Amino acid sequence: MIPVTILTISHFNRSDFLKILSKCVKKQDYPNIKEWVIIDTSFVGYYKTQQDLSSLIEEFRNDTDLPAIVYNKATTNNIGGWRNEGNSYVSGDIIVCMDDDDYYPPMRISHAVEKLKDKSSLIAGCDKMYFFDIHYNEFYLFNGFGQTHSTNNCMAYWREYINSHTYDETVTHAEETKFTNDFKEPMIQLETDKTVLQFSHNINTYDKKHIIHTNHVLPKEVKYITLLNKSVREFINNDEIYNDYETIFNKLRQPVKSEYDIVYYLGLCPQWSPLQKNLGGSEQAVIYLATEWAKQGKKVAVYGNLIHFGTIDGVEYIDFKKFQFWNQYDILILWRLYGFYPHINYNLKARKLLVDIHDNIPEPYELLMRYKNKITHWMVKSQYHKSYIEAITGQELSNGVIIPNGVRIKEFQKSVVETRNQFRMCYCSCYVRGLHRILSGIWPIIHQLEPRAELHVYYGMDLIVDENYKKELKQLLSQPGVMDHGKQPIEIINREKHMSNFHFYYSDYPGETDCITIKESLVAGCIPIISDFGVFKERHGVHLKWLPNTADFNQNIAHIVIELLHDTNIQEQLRKELVNSSTIISWEKIANEWINLFETP
């Protein structure tokens, strides 16, 4: 009968799991287990400790029901190195890998040996693996990546395989890639039910919660895990082992009180950096609010899909994958749909749970309403924003709170040019928010009537995915009098708004819920020319009635703009009035409004 070595990498922090694994080892139905090699990473691992597994190993060695224990302390620093160290100590003909925190059924070894014994391939694995997340309390199946794929915890291989295959010692996860020659080696696939049940928890070497989170937002056809109507109890039929796992899981599930007064959770949002100078309005709002709260002595954390992490202006910016949704929070703010979903499905614990909506996308509103009783406050940016949600859902937003975005007053009060160009205008919003009509239907008439007119366009096409639309826009942006500057930092935008006479934003875009850029133009003295649609009714400037996109109406609009360009008296009058607009509110005052809301019972 083929002698087998079990190989496990472990750590003092996971000694409770290792104890349960020893019970799984004793329950194996394969009779010729020669040894159990255990590599202890306690002193060199990712969570270094002052204690190691020595005492537990002595218990194992005194347990006559366990195979011979080969114990060594790791000397390398990463998972690939530890696995290579383990392979250097094995003496069995077949090595069966077992992770310390996974459950292995009694036929794990016998099934692997049976599949490997004819040596049609030197390595076996399981591409379609079960795993259970203890906090989501959900049972999943990996859909699989192919016949030559497996994670290490499912692998078994002949000892001669390691004569020509090693792990990459420089990586902290995905060490299997090099060991399997980029998953090109022929691999026998083991049966899922006979191999492993992997557990996802908060002390995994690799955090699988990111996999679950990402899977929630992927389209059905590309999801790589499947939620199963299955329970751990169905898979583990040994009462003692099952109860041992439940004891550990209940400890790990216990909520810990957050160290932060305010947590802003952004989820798997499009990636950005808190150091960027050319952010959109929603991202700006996070930075300015968090910074103002920190100035008031609040301990603030922002969890997001960020480029830069660390403490910036008193705020801690943290990878969203490190957010522990099962903990207890004081103030927890879920930002847009990215922060709201999927965690709203679960039992979030917070004294106050707020959803900072920002967007006006109808599809998520039904989902939001489904969980409305969990939410303390819906944070909306305008009366239009609130009314729009109520109209779409047919429900009153009784706990909706209108707090608009603030304005960077000091920045936009700084004039960096001496005079304005009378015939210069700017557009400073996403290019899908009305720019096409301006460029195709209105601008050609304006420029024909007044060849000195200029339109300077800012924002860029990074968020536009329709290549045909991009191509069409590029052509429109190349017409006389139009200059496309793309994405630019605040200093350039401020300079533009002090050079331009008007901010031309004639739009009926329903997704505009506040319009920070218009309020910034008021501060800079750049007179907004806006429609009377949606939120624009609530913003100050020259309002033009929203008219259908026809040649006659576009000509009417163009003529009104021409009149404004030539009437310097009305320009100065408007500029003096608009600089005192009640919509110009500093971020400091807006942050205080939020704080007052936090402090209400």
From Swiss-Prot:
Keywords: Glycosyltransferase, Transferase
InterPro entries: Glyco_trans_2-like, Nucleotide-diphossugar_trans
E.C. designation(s): 2.4.-.-
Example of a GO MF term: glycosyltransferase activity
Uppermost EC category: transferase
Entry keyword annotation includes Transcription regulation: no
Leader sequence residues: none
The keyword Transferase is annotated on this UniProt entry: yes
Family stated for the protein in its record: Belongs to the glycosyltransferase 2 family.
Name of the molecule in the record: Uncharacterized glycosyltransferase L193
